[in-house]
Amino acid sequence: MRKIIGIMCGLLIALTAYGQKGLIEHLRSGQAQHIVVYGTSLSSGACGNAWMRPVAAELNKRYGDSLVTYTLAGKGGMWSTWGVTHLEDSVIAKKPDAVIIEFGINDAFRDYQTSVAVARLNLEYMIDRIRLSVQDCEIFLQVMNMPIGKSAGFRPHLADYYAMYRETAQKKGVTLIDHYANWERVLEQGEAIFRTYVPDGIHPNTKGGEQIIAPHILKRILPTTSL
């Protein structure tokens, strides 16, 4: 009986999260917001800073200097199974106001042998666990760029994993930040142009972060009237 009551309470908390204020509403009211970015090398280190730094700068410019801070809590080469294992220490312990998740590109890495079904379970677990542990935390899912060259060969079914992210965002009622179409337009200009943004064929550089990724994040999270 206690177990059933606990589960019902947890579900109630998760459901009420849909009606709570989000990142922008809190910034408008002058509340400091800490964003945790959780994912692969595309969201970590120099790659992550390439787009999170301008995103944070723009939000601070609009809503108040130093209101927005962020932590890059992911790790290069990791995938959603690692994400589940390290969620408590890397994300929940930081009590974030918003979390941006992306593991799709490495879930698709064939050597990790992570099926779309397992990746979906991992992603849904992370969303549910964050909602249960950190009330009022807004969650965003990211679909990143396509790789080219040998990096693409290691991920023959990447489209299926990215499709799962889109489906999960809709199912869970979280905001999807889908960069894929923008990167397709860059790639349509030719591989040489694409590599000016993604030199090694998989990791966007500072130019890619600032010119392709950051503007679309702001477009998705800011109210339409403020763009």
Short names for language-model regions:
Residues 102-106, 129-162:
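Active-site segments of SGNH/GDSL-like serine hydrolases
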Residues 115-124, 157-162:
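Charged helix-capping and loop-helix junction motifs
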Residues 21-23, 144-227:
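Catalytic His-Asp segment of secreted/periplasmic serine-dependent ester chemistry enzymes
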Residues 2-10:
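Sec-dependent signal peptide recognition
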